[in-house]
Regions:
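Conserved active-site and SAM-binding loop architecture
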Residues: 1-154
Length: 154
């Protein structure tokens, strides 16, 4: 029996904690979508780490860590792996005006693979007790309340 490679897309990926769990469980990421640049940089770095580990070239990652210059974005490491590895981190805000462009990027990354699962953690401020207390009645009008609907579109 041939083992199927299970794939996922991570929406509202943050720095990739949920992705890390799925990767450790044997899933392969197709895309991580996150709006914050620092988190996207972390996603690119972790993608490079996983690629280099699979290729038996972890020493490249270790050298990067030893020689990393504070304030750099990681491009020294990212240039050591094929572009499609780091391109899996899509730095974009998910919304009506961006969704079609995101779909195009995901489709290009996906190729002929199927997506087995959509994962992600939308911003919790509008759901959490602390967030609701802080925002008061404005919580009902917070657009983050509606972000879960994008899971269906993917």
């Amino acid at each position: 029996m041939i083992k199927k490679e299970y794939t996922f897309i991570d929406l509202f990926a943050g720095a990739g904690g949920l992705s890390e769990g799925f990767i450790k469980a044997g899933f392969s990421p197709i895309a991580h979508i996150e709006m914050k640049q620092d988190a996207c940089n972390t996603l690119k770095t972790r993608s490079a780490f996983h690629y280099l580990t699979a290729q038996g070239k972890l020493s490249i990652y270790e050298d990067y860590l030893k020689n990393k210059v504070e304030g750099t974005d990681g491009s020294i490491l990212w240039n050591q792996v094929p572009p499609e590895v780091t391109n899996a981190a899509i730095c974009a805000t998910i919304g009506e005006d961006t969704i079609n462009g995101i779909f195009k990027k995901v489709d290009a990354l996906k190729g002929d693979k199927t997506v087995d699962i959509i994962i992600g953690g939308p911003p919790c401020q509008a759901y959490s007790v602390a967030g609701r207390a802080r925002m008061g009645k404005a919580v009902d009008e917070d657009p983050r309340n509606e972000l879960y609907k994008y899971y269906v579109q993917f």
